[in-house]
Amino acid sequence: MLTRVLFALVLAVASIPAWAEDAKVLALGLADHEVTQEELDKGTALAAPRFNTPAIAYTSIANLKKGDVVEIMLVNDDRPLLHSTETLAEDQAIYLLQAGKRGVPAGGWPEGSYHAALTVTRDAKPLIEQSSPPIPFD
């Protein structure tokens, strides 16, 4: 009897489609340029922003569903500076979202520690809230 129950459980789990998996963060961080999914897939270290370079907060997320709301922010200490928000029109196996500035603010970036902050909302409830480690812009 137990064998039949375990077999039925294995069949039920195996039949769940891939899109039903939980959303998960594949990458979250800061770079000195707009990143591509190919760069993130390679896993090579990305150049960190400095006070006199562009600064882009990025995230790559897997298994998002239609209607999910994804927000990425470039944050200095506790002050959000720039953000990008997208409501997905369809399911996404992998989704890349970025926010930042391709240029450099006059006089450079303000002093402080910067990080990327991510929020994913599903059905009006927070699903993921995560931040990258803070880095100073030297």
What annotation goes with each model-predicted range?
Residues 18-55, 138:
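Short, compositionally biased P/S/T/A/G/V-rich stretches that sit at domain boundaries
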Residues 56-62, 73:
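Short edge beta-strand/loop segments characteristic of extracellular beta-sandwich folds
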Residues 72-76, 120:
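Conserved aromatic beta-strand anchor motif in extracellular beta-sandwich/beta-rich domains
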Residues 80-93:
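Solvent-exposed serine/threonine-rich low-complexity stretches and specific carbohydrate-binding patches
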Residues 91-104:
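Aromatic sugar-binding surface patches on proteins
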Residues 110-121:
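A short tyrosine-centered beta-strand micro-motif
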Residues 126-138:
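Short beta-strand elements
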